[in-house]
Amino acid sequence: MPAQAFYEMDGQRLVPSGLTRGPWDPGAQHAGPPSALIARALERCEPRDGMEIGRITIEILRPVPLAPLKLRAEVVRPGRSVELLEASLSGPDGVLMRARAWRVASSAAGPPPERPAAGPADGAERPFFPTGQEIGYHTAMEYRFMRGAFLEPGPATVWMRMRVALVEGEDPTPLQRVMVAADSGNGVSAALDWRTHLFINTDLSVHLLRVPETEWVCLEAETLLGSNGLADTALWDERGRIGRAAQTLLVRPRA
């Protein structure tokens, strides 16, 4: 039976399915699902009513293998209205990702959100990169492009939705849905041809105005190139703007 989730629990470990596989290496995960696991650990770390994650920054220390994972999270700076949290994701050979997050007191003081110009029903499916992999992250997600495509270098606007659960038997939270999708900013807006160049992110920083209220998350992404690379992504749900994501990119020709 095909996997119905990115991960399943095995005691204190999370075991990845083939749906976590990324486009760069068949033995490594796309960073979206493990980023969402970190969000899950942060959400479960001493949660408090009236507080929301306002920012998560994840450092990707090395590729995440398709192997059992463990997570740790703690509050390192407690506070009445602002808290700093840290989390780590580890595999058989040590720590793979480290993260810091600000949890802040929520407020309804802002104006009504600006609505996106068009929703996922107006988008189109586009072919994924020719990885040769029949199963992976790309088959676990739905894509509806409003602008651009995987194989068309340049800015892109795409709606994304999870086809499967993050963890078997659990409904994904709004924050987890954002993190699964946000790591795709560099992929959907590639400035160079995937067949000739690598553009791998070393981090992911997500700033949130609010968590999404719909299953679909929209990435309005652009990749900028200098001596390094930067993927800059505006994040939306079907009600309006929810935040922004940024990724530092390692850019180089394929060997």
Feature locations, PLM:
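Terminal targeting signals and extreme-terminal segments of soluble enzymes
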Residues: 1-255
